[in-house]
């Protein structure tokens, strides 16, 4: 846009080179544009005024640089003199050409206001010459919890001093470089992408938990340094230990522990790059002016008198600096007070507390791997932890990887310690550091419209309803976005991987079609009449008049911060489920997400409700209704095949449809008690796959026998394992309250699976609607390996009605008197002769 303005002003065409940094030519461009607009007497100013912003922290001036899009960064001793400021090719437009009076007008009267606090922080002598300390800078960026389909970094000993980063969007690669005279451990990322820390970020906290309960739960592992509970009502707390081993032990022992019927989700918290004074001490001391003849063993003997030392590190290009990390931050403070300004090896040393995370990846260990393993194990035994006797992570010993120009690691799923440098949210001194172009281009770039997202299993919402706002999973906290370039607001799911990019589609799951996007829409038009009428089904579907109220209390996620998102569009009841957006398609009937069959949606048409303009789902086209005879009270169902655009985004469909607008399916007990909630069909999630239908029925009937009239457990025909969830229809909405209290957050007793059950409303509501869905040949015809097991408990209904309902589609056996049916597909390769054998085989 700037170049266009300048072109208009000067009356000639100007083009920026496609790979040239805009900031490089900005001084000359602005100078010429202002001169053109003001007749040659205008002001000439630089575009680097962002340096003078005191409202934004200069977090990255110590490790990042703005560079051309095709260049790479590297900091080492070959760096040119930083006192010389060179900005791209703009040397020809020197500041000498700027009129002095123009500069006087631009500058404030009081020179102290020019750079408030900036000169004091500008210490070029302390600039690092490697990117080993590059990591997340926000307390909420915990990393971890992800299951990435990429090669583990633990198998590579990578010299982080050779790391080089690019500003090409979110593509990241780092190149091992030979590091002379070092042999030993090279620390890599902690498992699950986390870096060990003394501070634990505990999510999914019940707001009613007392501080004393948290202290009693975490104190057995070590003395607590601080307990931050101000955000407990938003679902998380932060617990900081003095000893890093205590944090490791607490995380290992308490991960997935139940507290007030909530499963704790614990991660390491990365300290901020600009911590407060009380948080500055992270247990690491920096020794300046230490003689090179002083060995690490001598330092270990001297500093070890004040506490247990975790490791001693030295940087390859700064031989006069050493890093000493203590397990306990109090020991580091004691050593700092005792040994600062003391003499070692004939030189007066200076001690300072290292900034959090500074230079902790490159290390020359003072102890062997076995010794560290023994110390950590002994500490776990002392605090009584039942965790495994292994240190937190893989810490290989050996020489670093030799430098190779063609060896690179590409992390398309996000790398927590590398971020793009040329982005809008990185102001400050990063722009004045000189660029070092490199000939290395061995990486696979992704779209430059993507930001680096930790745990970024990102969902793309419909543009008409949510305006590109992505939701996270229930029990999740909106995470920090690093290096984000996209303009859309994003809430990131915690246990996920991959990138998400916004794209425009006509429909998304959860968005109504255009004819429903106006406030006057109150119902579904009938195919036989132009009269609009609401749903009138038993156990009912939400009435159209209740559409607004259905969204009222579902705008936030349980155990997390409110999303503060307001719905401006009314929605129909069939708008897609966060977990089962297609009824059965996402629960395992079609496990091949690259198959277009998984896109097919099925809308159930009820008497008086059929419509040719019903919402067909994500990119689906509607078809004429297919009538079926023999079903009582059901006239037709509507199978919806996939449209052509559904094939294009097969890979995105699972992630995009899984977490969309989960608030609408949240069970609100207050609404049930007040009578505002009339839905009765639930989905039970996280069922162990080895649970059989009889096991599930027995567990439900233990306390809720007679409270439900429909139970369906989808099962894989080949391996006899269920698909991890079931559908249940309660007789009355009031029965949901005790059922929710029993099963939501329940740990399944059998098989020691560790899965925690959760409940939500299903997309298809009502026993009749579920039965009609199963009656549809298209819903099961292509998936012969699956069959549902359905239980009925209607004592007043005749058995012949049930047989009539399913006889045209399913082979039915009635093993008991409570009308518990085991249903098999007719296309099943199993023989259908003996009903009793079929029932035993399917169960």
UniProtKB/Swiss-Prot annotation:
Biological process (GO) annotations held by this record are: meiotic cell cycle; positive regulation of growth; positive regulation of meiotic nuclear division
Q: Which residues form the RRM domain?
A: 198-271, 283-356
- A Gene Ontology MF term for this entry? RNA binding
**Which InterPro entries would you find in this protein's record?**
MEI2-like_RRM1, MEI2-like_RRM3, Mei2-like_Rrm_C, Nucleotide-bd_a/b_plait_sf, RBD_domain_sf, RRM_dom
State whether keyword RNA-binding applies. Answer: yes
The record's listing under Pfam families reads: RRM_1, RRM_2
* Keywords noted in UniProt: Meiosis, Repeat, RNA-binding
When the coding gene is removed by deletion, what phenotypic consequences does the entry describe?
Early flowering.
Which PROSITE patterns does this UniProt record tie to the protein? RRM (PS50102)
Q: What does this protein do?
A: Probable RNA-binding protein that plays a role in meiosis and vegetative growth.
Q: What is this protein called?
A: Protein MEI2-like 2
Q: Which organism is it from?
A: Arabidopsis thaliana (Mouse-ear cress)
Name the gene for this chain.
ML2
């Amino acid at each position: 846009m700037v170049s266009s303005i300048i072109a208009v002003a000067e009356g000639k065409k100007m083009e920026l080179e496609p790979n040239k940094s805009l900031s490089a030519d900005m001084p000359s461009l602005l100078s010429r544009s202002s001169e053109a607009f003001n007749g040659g007497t205008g002001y000439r100013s630089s575009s680097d005024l962002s340096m003078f912003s005191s409202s934004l922290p200069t977090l990255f001036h110590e490790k990042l640089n703005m560079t051309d899009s095709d260049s790479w960064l590297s900091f080492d001793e070959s760096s040119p003199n930083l006192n010389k400021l060179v900005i791209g090719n703009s040397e020809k437009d020197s500041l000498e050409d700027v009129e002095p009076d123009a500069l006087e007008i631009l500058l404030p009267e009081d020179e102290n206001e020019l750079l408030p606090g900036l000169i004091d922080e500008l210490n070029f002598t302390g600039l690092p010459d490697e990117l080993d300390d590059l990591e997340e800078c926000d307390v909420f960026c915990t990393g971890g919890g992800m299951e990435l389909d990429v090669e583990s970094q633990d198998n590579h000993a990578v010299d982080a001093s050779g790391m080089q980063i690019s500003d090409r969007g979110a593509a990241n690669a780092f190149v091992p470089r030979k590091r002379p005279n070092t042999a030993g451990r090279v620390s890599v990322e902690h498992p699950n992408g986390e870096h060990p820390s003394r501070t634990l970020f505990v999510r999914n906290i019940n707001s009613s938990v007392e501080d004393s309960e948290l202290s009693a739960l975490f104190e057995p592992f070590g003395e607590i340094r601080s307990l931050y509970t101000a955000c407990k009502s938003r679902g998380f707390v932060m617990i900081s230990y003095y000893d890093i081993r205590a944090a490791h032990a607490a995380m290992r022992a308490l991960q997935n522990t139940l507290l007030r019927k909530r499963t704790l989700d614990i991660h390491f918290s990365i300290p901020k790059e600009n911590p407060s004074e009380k948080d500055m001490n992270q247990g690491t001391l920096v020794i300046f002016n230490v003689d090179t003849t002083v060995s690490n063993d001598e330092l270990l003997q001297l500093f070890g008198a004040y506490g247990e030392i975790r490791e001693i590190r030295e940087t390859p290009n700064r031989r006069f600096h050493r890093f000493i990390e203590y397990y306990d931050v109090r020991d580091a403070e004691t050593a700092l007070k005792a040994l600062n300004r003391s003499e070692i090896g004939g030189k007066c040393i200076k001690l300072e507390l290292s900034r959090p995370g500074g230079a902790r990846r490159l290390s020359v260990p003072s102890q062997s791997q076995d010794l560290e393993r023994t110390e950590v194990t002994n500490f776990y035994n002392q605090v009584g932890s039942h965790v495994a006797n292994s240190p937190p992570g893989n810490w290989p010993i050996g020489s670093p990887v030799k430098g190779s120009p063609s060896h690179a690691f590409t992390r398309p799923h996000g790398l927590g310690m590398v971020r793009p440098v040329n982005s809008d949210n990185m102001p400050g001194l990063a722009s004045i550091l000189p660029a070092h172009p490199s000939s290395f281009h061995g990486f696979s770039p992704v779209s430059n419209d993507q930001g680096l997202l930790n745990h970024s299993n990102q969902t793309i919402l419909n543009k008409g309803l949510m305006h590109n706002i992505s939701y996270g999973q229930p029990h999740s906290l909106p995470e920090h976005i690093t290096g984000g370039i996209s303009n859309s607001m994003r809430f990131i799911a915690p246990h996920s991987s991959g990138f998400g990019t916004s794209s425009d589609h006509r429909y998304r799951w959860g968005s109504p079609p255009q004819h429903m996007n106006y406030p006057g829409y109150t119902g579904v038009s009938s195919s036989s009449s132009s009269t609009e009428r609401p749903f009138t089904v038993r156990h009912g579907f939400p009435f159209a008049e209740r559409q607004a109220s259905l969204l009222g209390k579902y705008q936030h996620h349980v155990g997390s911060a409110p999303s503060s998102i307001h719905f401006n569009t009314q929605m129909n009841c069939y708008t897609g489920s966060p977990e089962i957006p297609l009824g059965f398609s996402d629960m395992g009937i079609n496990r091949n997400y690259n198959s277009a069959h998984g896109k097919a949606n099925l809308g159930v048409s009820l008497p008086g409700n059929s419509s040719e303009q019903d919402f067909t789902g994500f990119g689906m086209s509607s078809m004429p209704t297919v009538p079926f005879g023999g079903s009582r009270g059901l006239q037709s169902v509507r199978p919806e095949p996939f449209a052509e655009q559904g094939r294009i985004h097969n890979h995105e469909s699972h992630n995009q449809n899984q977490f969309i607008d989960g608030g609408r399916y949240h069970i609100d007990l207050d609404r049930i008690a007040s009578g505002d909630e009339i839905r009765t069909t639930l989905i039970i999630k996280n069922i162990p796959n080895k649970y059989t239908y009889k096991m599930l029925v027995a567990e439900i009937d233990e306390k809720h026998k007679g409270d439900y009239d429909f139970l369906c457990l989808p099962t894989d025909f080949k391996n006899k394992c269920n698909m991890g969830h079931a559908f249940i229809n309660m007789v009355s909405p009031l029965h949901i309250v005790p059922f929710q209290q029993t099963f939501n957050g329940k740990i399944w007793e059998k098989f020691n699976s560790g899965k925690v059950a959760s409940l939500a409303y299903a997309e298809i509501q009502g026993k009749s609607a579920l039965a009609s869905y199963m009656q549809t040949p298209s819903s099961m015809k292509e998936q012969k390996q699956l069959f549902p097991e359905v239980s009925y408990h209607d004592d007043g209904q005749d058995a012949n009605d049930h047989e009539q309902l399913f006889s045209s589609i399913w082979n039915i056996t009635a093993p008991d008197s409570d009308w518990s049916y085991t249903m098999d597909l007719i296309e099943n390769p199993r023989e259908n002769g003996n009903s009793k054998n079929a029932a035993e085989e399917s169960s």
